[in-house]
Amino acid sequence: MNSMEIRQAFAGLLTLSMFIMLGNMIKKDHFDYPAEEVEIQTTEVSQHDLATVSHISQKSKQNDKALKPCWNPPTLKEVEQSKGFIIFSLTNGPEYHIAQVADAVVVAKYLGATLVLPDIKNSKSGNSMNLGDIYDVENVLNKLNGLVKVTKTLPPHVSTRNTPIVRVPNKVSQDYIMKKLKPIYQAKGIIKIESYFPSKNTISRNNNSLESLLCQTMFGGTLELKKEIQEEAESIVQKLETWSQESNGPFVAVDLRIEGLKNECNGKDGKGRKQCYQGHEIGEFLKRIGFGQETVIYVTQTKWSPDLNSLRYMFPKTYTKENIMSSTKKEKFINSESIEFEKAIDFYICSESDVFVPSILGPFYENVAGMRIVSGKNEIIVPSEVVSPSASASEHMSPYVTKKNHLAYKCFC
């Protein structure tokens, strides 16, 4: 290498060194912040905080948790099929409907009668609606096929005039049917039954065959919503799930109807415990057991009420059907003369949510709990007045789940 080439190589090396030094100076002046300025901000999380809602903040693997039917096919001693009929109506809202169907199936099966598909009594007007206005009639027929003889309507020659009306307790027993219903049925050939719901009732008095029939009717998918209502309910659930995923938390359904609380809330029970909770009380409870303000909450109240403002203040992502439905769907399902449409949608949403919280303990809570238990959605939280500073959501799980004292556990295992 001659002297000229050496000088050129040295000059190039010097230039490269200058660029490196300049780069380091720029980096130091503009990008190397003091350590305290770039330290990641962290929030101390206690073991208690982690124990509150972490187990329900992610989608549970519901297929893994779902129970399996453990009833055997009904083996009632074959009852001679008679020429008589059992008629009934669905009343008081969807939370009662499947239990009413199950009672009617058990009665018809035991008496050897033909079951006539029911109408639906409008809770507002008392007028009759067709079963197909809310439910999939063909599905009902398919599910009951083989369990009991069913007809859509009474034959023209059969009159319902002077039909005896007999009240039967929900989860009616074989003994009750034999003593109270059978003599009337044999004399008249037709009975209209009306289910009533005792405050305490079990199916322990029934034989295994009647229990199996009851289980299969209640939890075998007998009552499914008609397609249009089902699709709307699914659409709402999908929206709420999407919003909850964006918030990285659970989607909580709260059964809270302002009018219902005013009409049904009886203050405290015999032991001095609250029987119902207002919106602000639900909000405070959820905060204390660890739910963050980004939690997505669905409330069964149809239209927004000022009574819910405090709940939304604590949980801004609180919605009602009115906030979610399109104007067309609102006109059809909310502004109609029948509350049955919206209550059917509420029942579905509360059965499918990540977490269910009842503001009042009653049939809606009991039957939603049953649907959730059999599908493995055990996150049912019951509010409480007294919440300790170290309380967690798991401490307030429904006794239906913790004590396994729901009918569903007699039917599934």
From Swiss-Prot:
Q: Give ranges for the Cytoplasmic compartment.
A: 1-5
A Pfam family found in this protein is O-FucT
Q: In which tissues is it expressed?
A: Highly and specifically expressed in the endosperm.
Q: Which GO terms describe its biological process?
A: cell wall organization; fucose metabolic process
Source organism superkingdom:
Eukaryota
Q: List residues binding substrate.
A: D255, L256, R257
Membrane topology qualifier: Single-pass type II membrane protein
Q: What is its EC number?
A: 2.4.1.-
Alphabetically ordered keywords of this record? Carbohydrate metabolism, Cell wall biogenesis/degradation, Fucose metabolism, Glycoprotein, Glycosyltransferase, Golgi apparatus, Membrane, Signal-anchor, Transferase, Transmembrane, Transmembrane helix
Keyword ATP-binding in annotation? no
Please provide, in alphabetical order, the Gene Ontology terms of the cellular component aspect for this entry: Golgi apparatus; Golgi membrane
The pathway it acts in is: Glycan biosynthesis
Keyword flag Cytoplasm: no
Residue positions with a glycan = N207
Localization per record: Golgi apparatus membrane
Q: What class of enzyme is it?
A: transferase
Molecular function (GO) terms listed? glycosyltransferase activity
User: Which ranges sit in the Lumenal compartment?
Assistant: 27-413
Q: What does this protein do?
A: Glycosyltransferase involved in mannan biosynthesis.
Membership in a protein family: Belongs to the glycosyltransferase GT106 family.
Q: Which PANTHER family match?
A: O-FUCOSYLTRANSFERASE FAMILY PROTEIN
Please report the name of this protein according to its UniProt entry.
Protein MANNAN SYNTHESIS-RELATED
The protein's organism comes out as Trigonella foenum-graecum (Fenugreek)
